[in-house]
Amino acid sequence: MGARASVLSGGKLDSWEKIRLRPGGRKKYKLKHIVWASRELGRFALNRDLLETAEGCVQIMKQLQPALTGTEELRSLFNTVATLYCVHQKIEVKDTKEAPEEVEKIQKNSQQEIQQAAKNEGNSNPVSQNYPIVQNAQGQMIHQAISPWTLNAWVKVVEEKAFSPEVIPMFSALSEGATPQDLNTMLNTVGGHQAAMQMLKDTINDEAAEWDRIHPQQAGPIPPGQIREPSGSDIAGTTSTLQEQIRWMTSNPPIPVGEIYKRWIILGLNKIVRMYSPVSILDIRQGPKEPFRDYVDRFFKTLRAEQATQEVKGWMTDTLLVQNANPDCKTILRALGPGATLEEMMTACQGVGGPSHKARVLAEAMSQASGAAAAAIMMQKSNFKGPRRIIKCFNCGKEGHLARNCRAPRKKGCWKCGKEGHQMKECTERQANFLRENLAFQQGEARKLSPEQDRANSPTSRELRIRRGDSPLPEAGAKGEGAISLNFPQITLWQRPLVTVKIGGQLIEALLDTGADDTVLEGINLPGKWKPKMIGGIGGFIKVRQYDQILIEIGGKKAIGTVLVGPTPINIIGRNMLTQIGCTLNFPISPIETVPVKLKPGMDGPRVKQWPLTEEKIKALTEICKDMEKEGKISKIGPENPYNTPIFAIKKKDSTKWRKLVDFRELNKRTQDFWEVQLGIPHPAGLKKKRSVTVLDVGDAYFSVPLDKDFRKYTAFTIPSINNETPGIRYQYNVLPQGWKGSPAIFQSSMTKILEPSRTKNPEMVIYQYMDDLYVGSDLEIGQHRAKIEELREHLLKWGLTTPDKKHQKEPPFLWMGYELHPDKWTVQPIQLPEKEDWTVNDIQKLVGKLNWASQIYPGIKVKHLCRLLRGAKALTDIVPLTAEAEMELAENREILKEPVHGVYHDPSKELIAEVQKQGPDQWTYQIYQEPYKNLKTGKYAKRGSAHTNDVKQLTEVVQKIATEGIVIWGKIPKFKLPIRKETWEVWWTEYWQAAWIPEWEFVNTPPLVKLWYQLETEPIPGAETYYVDGAANRETKLGKAGHVTDKGKQKIITLTETTNQKAELHAIQLALQDSRPEVNIVTDSQYALGIIQAQPDRSGSELVNQIIEQLIKKEKVYLSWVPAHKGIGGNEQVDKLVSSGIRKVLFLDGIDKAQEEHERYHSNWRAMASDFNLPPVVAKEIVASCDKCQLKGEAMHGQVDCSPGIWQLDCTHLEGKIIIVAVHVASGYIEAEVIPAETGQETAYFILKLAGRWPVKVIHTDNGPNFISAAVKAACWWANITQEFGIPYNPQSQGVVESMNKELKKIIGQVGDQAEHLKTAVQMAVFIHNFKRKGGIGGYSAGERIIDIIASDIQTKELQKQIIKIQNFRVYYRDSRDPIWKGPAKLLWKGEGAVVIQDNNEIKVVPRRKAKILKDYGKQMAGGDCVAGRQDED
């Protein structure tokens, strides 16, 4: 502030502080006002030192004067400088108002003096007014370099406006009178905008070449005293000196090289502006409710960016501004006439737009339209006589609009009779309810008819039927025997349904009109009295005579009712007669060939009980089903059908009507699988541009296609009665049901078959079909196109598929699949982002969905921070506070969505180009186009594949996403333009093995460029110090050490807390990078750390890795190498000892790597690894704990059931819709399992025989499933001599072992699922893993080892039993070591090689073989009296 205070000193400061800010005000000027003024001058590129002198103040005022019409701030600045000037000149002023007036007087006087002097001198020496070229005291032209303030102002403009249209006038103003050298200085200051500068350079080169073509250089030397003609490159300042530029600009006649170069730059800036704001002036149209002022703002903002001459821009303003206004404003503007100024236009159009204005205009027009002529202008002309009917609203009762356009709140109840509980279209008052009660529709099946059959008799067309006789409809039998249609005349609706009718003995031709309430005839004389009446006809009101109780005969059926006679254009038989004769309008089911459908093998239909429903739901469902039955969509069934699916009803959105829903989940599980006909939805960017387009919708799509007859029984459902008063009413579907899994696929394939003839017949028509949406495009003239569309609709109708007029779109924009299609462009349907105070999880999910949908055409949409709000397990209704970043992101997205953005259509003759830009950390955006600035499609990518990543890796992921998208939409891969230099890509691609293929691409200089921030050397750096690094941590205490040892004997160790081995390894590398010189070799034994750093990440989710990245960027060269741990390698062993002391318990575990490898493949449990690789349990458990697939549950401890070796439990389990049969050996837990095609007795028996052929099976234990109790299984068990036992019904514990094994097996299948393509492979892999790679339970064996051990032990035991029986026939005589007398005989229990085991008097002894005699016991008779053996009997 001190520097600026020096502007005034001493007495001047006193007089400054006496001047009032306002006339008569109390506040006076202070020093702070001078400080403020000096700051403001920086914005206008003016030197602040000018304030110190009166001349300086004059110069400032000259600069500011042209801009005084601008803001208030500018006016304040001018006034302050004027006051300061008065203080410098010692002109006495009391307040701010007086100062500018004084200045004005002085300026006028000096101007007159200058003019006078000019007259006197006769303008002999005109001084160039061109600044920065000025004349010095000697009269020479010299150059004043462009000031830093001007450059500063220019840089600010570019940074703030980012090449928006405002940049061009700003540039033009700042470069007033500049030389080419000055202009190049200005361009160099904004050289960071590389893409823009490149475009500018191209434009300048083109213009310079054009200049050289028009102004060829003269050949030979230049005559003395003359200056050379400038070339294109001279004008651009590249081959000319500053002196030459000044001479050209000040010569007589001058060559304004500065102005020419400036014009070229402005041309280039125009192109840049077009790229940065790619909206054409032709696209600026006023919205229906947009204020005229906003439209004008948008129009002129875009006009400034247009590349056109001033004349063309003038023409655009005169014509396009009016032409593209909305109809309301256009009417007013045209009335103003062609010469109207913009001010007049804006005044006239103030407040125009919106419904209130429309109502005002309409009211005025109606009040003026008194005569018939005015009425003719307002109303449509008609061919019918009589007065025009005035429309009146049912809802509010006012005239002039219909109820559907009414803005008043909706009146409750019916608009016709006023009663609540139904709407007008369901009202029975004054309306023959001919589509509801007593309808005669065949109850049988929809008959298959060939399209060639005569349509007059075909029930597949829309038709009217008239019932003969008064008998009500006979019930159709279960087999659809009621071929009722034979009794009825059938009138098809291919032509108008005209019939001959007998009235009062006269025959006349009349139209059967199901839409007319009354019967109206013309030119017929009827007997009896009549009364006059007015009725509303097609062309207005007509006067008729009303005759009551008239007999009428149609098709042999009589009816008595009211007939009206009057001037009707055609005789009409209305509903008052049609209902009496039982005439029905029938919606037949399509004659499309049915697609055969089956249940999955071995499965039966659903048998799910109907749950109770409320009375109102039962009533609603009864009504709906009656209607569906009349239309042939469902049929009643008897008790013979055992299947059932539950149904329920829900209220339709914003309506009192109910909607029937069927819970087909169980049937869907049991129905065969279908191939999804269409894998995704079509995208408009893949459409080709067509001259004529129509969008159609197939009405009641699924209900138009018949269901396979043999499958219908499985769709049975029941409408229950209240309090089980009567049995429920049972129905089954005849058509594709909503919610059944086969409906979409069958409908799509049927639709394709139906459309095939149309596609073949009209190859010039493009038909896109997605479910019931049809897009038809052609290059035909609109009349021919519409004729073809009618042909197509007719063709669809022959097959029973209607295309309602309500959803038939003839004019653009077409709404299709959530997109809005225009003739030459497309966009997504308008997206409204909700404004909310509190956002729930569900709200944010919907918001992200909307933004993702919009991102396919709106470039720059981001959702990263909004998605972050959804992290963690939250309930849908939880309220989530928005973070500042998410608020910012949402605000940016709202801004982007404000301006509508359009994509164009695909031109197969041009190549596709995809351009990618980096938007921010982990956020990318791309555009796919064929011509610049005309995007087919845009998109974003914001995934982060791994914790440590870099831009190159992400760029490859983006490219692969776009390539896939290209193949799906256009069938080809676009050519890529990527913001990465070829050298950078090559370096990374050759070094980093995980890089995937990327297609053909070229470099585009769009900042920010993707680069590798550092590079690791491939060979050790000679002369650089080598750091051996290591880290260790204790799992229990979380304490650790990290450190390094160098080849020069230096060492450093730090202690860490709350760490892990992996973190400690990274700490050691960070320490080495921190302590080392710019070039360093680092040796680690951690594969983990090596893997992270070799991928060259430039950012990471880990703070520690980010620190390492920072250190790596600072280094000149880094070589990182790995050595195996604990292998006695010099420096590695030294550092290992240092960091291990007091930390590591086990220093050397060689088997870890192999164990980890085995675990990745087989997911063995810790016991198996501990025993196979000699690992301590804690290490083996750690391997299991670090595996994400084995984290599902804790380690299972398999206890043993004490069972005999021949018992197996069998069961069937289901996975992925397939059946797996599982057999478990109860004693060992060993499994045999395989996928079987069906859960039948045959398959089960075959499996049991296979099992018996491999293992000794004595007993099988199964549940009571139909396959296990089948005859085939009994026969197999009888043949293989296996006893079959059954579990207790409904008690899963009786099958406990196999049930728990099913779970175990499914768990293992889940762990190895991604290694196998088919389930049967995964099952066998899981069996192998369970049997041989999991240890535990008795003996710590695996199940495979245990079963072999159990069977072997069993055989040995049996053998032993036999031996024991034999051995018991021997007697042993023995003697002790001290006693020479033989003792015995004792029982022989065991005879070994060196000793025998004997039992003597219940005492078991081991006797050496040499001291025992074994004799066979031949019985008593063999022994003599004095035989030693005789003692036995005495004993």
Swiss-Prot record:
CCHC-type zinc finger segments: 391-408, 412-429
GO molecular function, one term: DNA-directed DNA polymerase activity
Annotated Basic and acidic residues bias: 445-455
Span of the annotated motif Nuclear export signal: 16-22
Ranges of Polar residues composition bias in the record: 108-126
One example of a Gene Ontology biological process annotation: DNA recombination
Zinc finger extent (Integrase-type): 1150-1191
Cofactor: record remark: Binds 2 magnesium ions for reverse transcriptase polymerase activity.
Gene: gag-pol
Name of the protein this chain belongs to: Gag-Pol polyprotein
PROSITE patterns: ASP_PROT_RETROV, ASP_PROTEASE, INTEGRASE, INTEGRASE_DBD, RNASE_H_1, RT_POL, ZF_CCHC, ZF_INTEGRASE
Domain RNase H type-1 residues, every copy: 1021-1144
Site positions for Cis/trans isomerization of proline peptide bond: 220-221
Region (Interaction with human PPIA/CYPA and NUP153): 188-226
Region entry Interaction with Gp41, spans: 7-31
Annotated stretches, region: Dimerization/Multimerization of capsid protein p24: 276-362
Residues binding Mg(2+) 2: 1030, 1065, 1085, 1136
SUPFAM superfamilies xref list: Acid proteases (SSF50630), DNA-binding domain of retroviral integrase (SSF50122), DNA/RNA polymerases (SSF56672), N-terminal Zn binding domain of HIV integrase (SSF46919), Retroviral matrix proteins (SSF47836), Retrovirus capsid dimerization domain-like (SSF47353), Retrovirus capsid protein, N-terminal core domain (SSF47943), Retrovirus zinc finger-like domains (SSF57756)
Keywords for the protein's UniProt record, in alphabetical order: Activation of host caspases by virus, AIDS, Aspartyl protease, Capsid protein, DNA integration, DNA recombination, DNA-binding, DNA-directed DNA polymerase, Endonuclease, Eukaryotic host gene expression shutoff by virus, Eukaryotic host translation shutoff by virus, Host cell membrane, Host cytoplasm, Host endosome, Host gene expression shutoff by virus, Host membrane, Host nucleus, Host-virus interaction, Hydrolase, Lipid-binding, Lipoprotein, Magnesium, Membrane, Metal-binding, Modulation of host cell apoptosis by virus, Multifunctional enzyme, Myristate, Nuclease, Nucleotidyltransferase, Phosphoprotein, Protease, Repeat, RNA-binding, RNA-directed DNA polymerase, Transferase, Viral genome integration, Viral nucleoprotein, Viral penetration into host nucleus, Viral release from host cell, Virion, Virion maturation, Virus entry into host cell, Zinc, Zinc-finger
Interaction with host AP3D1, as annotated region: 12-19
Protein source organism: Human immunodeficiency virus type 1 group M subtype G (isolate 92NG083) (HIV-1)
Residue numbers spanned by region Interaction with membrane phosphatidylinositol 4,5-bisphosphate: 72-76
Residues annotated as catalytic: 513 (for protease activity)
